[in-house]
A protein has these predicted regions:
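Extracellular ligand-binding/catalytic regions of CAZymes and related secreted enzymes
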Residues: 56, 69, 73-97, 134-211
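Structured loop/turn residues at beta-strand edges in well-structured enzyme cores
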Residues: 10
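A glycine-rich, often tryptophan-bearing local segment used as a flexible ligand/cofactor-contacting loop or short
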Residues: 23-124, 136-138, 143-145
Length: 211
């Protein structure tokens, strides 16, 4: 709807982009471009304009880095506008996450998202590890507990803010944590508080995969 011009983003202050497990799906025969890409050109342009006009973006999804890492144009958009970069796929098997910014979340949180069969929530088997784009001013605000790979980043800018998660928000198992995280993100967008802090680059546990 946004790409087709049916929704005017100027009517909104913040945008929640839910990509879930969406990724490019090729046709069986080379008759057309792959469908369901993360950030097709028209949508990326609309989000770019939204941010540059002061709009905030909360983005989550399992393939938000993997799906665009080999496309220079979409990668430039992710790094320069949303302020995140792909680091790895298959970033965690168990889905355990911890937060790393008390200024944003109010306190340290440990939670899990679903990666396997669940009767009520689909499993995100192959989430992305994402990190702050180089020289972007963004920072890691969540990590995967099993290896300390960056799981989410936030950008506190002069014109707009972003929070980017490399796993689907809706896959977080406990509603209590979904509520707490969403409230913290919306408060960050609404109040524009400064969340910049000096945090160890390797998180609170040691691993050969630390950034």
């Amino acid at each position: 709807a946004v790409s087709a011009g049916l929704v005017d983003l100027e009517d909104y202050r913040s945008l929640d982009i839910v990509y879930g497990e969406q990724k490019a799906t090729p046709w069986p025969k080379p008759v057309a471009e792959p469908r369901f890409r993360v950030f097709p050109v028209e949508f990326a342009q609309a989000v770019r304009n939204f941010c540059l006009q002061g709009g905030n973006v909360f983005l989550s999804g399992a393939y938000i880095g993997t799906d665009l890492k080999d496309d220079p144009e979409r990668r430039e958009f992710a790094e320069n506008i949303l302020k995140y970069a792909w680091r790895t796929d298959y970033a965690t098997r168990g889905g355990a996450v911890y937060t790393q910014n008390a200024l944003l979340f109010g306190k340290d949180l440990d939670f899990n998202f679903v990666t396997e069969f669940h009767p009520k929530i689909y499993g995100a088997e192959n989430p992305d590890g994402i990190e702050a784009a180089k020289n972007s001013g963004a920072q890691t605000v969540m990590r995967y507990a099993e290896n300390n790979v960056s799981a989410a980043v936030a950008y506190n800018g002069e014109e707009y803010n972003t929070v980017i998660m490399g796993f689907p928000f809706e896959c977080i198992e406990e509603r209590e944590y979904r509520d707490m995280l969403m409230k913290a993100i919306l408060d960050f967008f609404e109040n524009d508080q400064d969340i910049r802090q000096n945090t160890p680059k390797d998180g609170r546990k040691k691993s050969s995969l630390n950034n």
